[in-house]
Amino acid sequence: MAFTCSDIFKIILAIILPPLGVFLERGCGADLLINILLTILGYIPGIIHALYIILKY
């Protein structure tokens, strides 16, 4: 699987602000709400979920 420039940009954003990376990848939906909740509960789970979403789709 090759990474594009936009994927790398989304990964950097996911490390800084996880919900923003998920929003750019999947839009406003259940994945975004889950990521916001995970980020509120703990920053690291939010990052892990964001990276999973970006790398999966």
From Swiss-Prot:
<keyword id="KW-0472">Membrane</keyword>
<keyword id="KW-0812">Transmembrane</keyword>
<comment type="function">
    <text>Plays a role in the regulation of membrane potential. Could mediate a proton leak.</text>
</comment>
<keyword id="KW-1003">Cell membrane</keyword>
<protein>
    <recommendedName>
        <fullName>Plasma membrane proteolipid 3</fullName>
    </recommendedName>
</protein>
<feature type="transmembrane region" description="Helical">
    <location>
        <begin position="34"/>
        <end position="54"/>
    </location>
</feature>
<comment type="similarity">
    <text>Belongs to the UPF0057 (PMP3) family.</text>
</comment>
<dbReference type="GO" id="GO:0005886">
    <property type="term" value="C:plasma membrane"/>
</dbReference>
<dbReference type="Pfam" id="PF01679">
    <property type="entry name" value="Pmp3"/>
</dbReference>
<dbReference type="InterPro" id="IPR000612">
    <property type="entry name" value="PMP3"/>
</dbReference>
<feature type="transmembrane region" description="Helical">
    <location>
        <begin position="3"/>
        <end position="23"/>
    </location>
</feature>
<keyword id="KW-1133">Transmembrane helix</keyword>
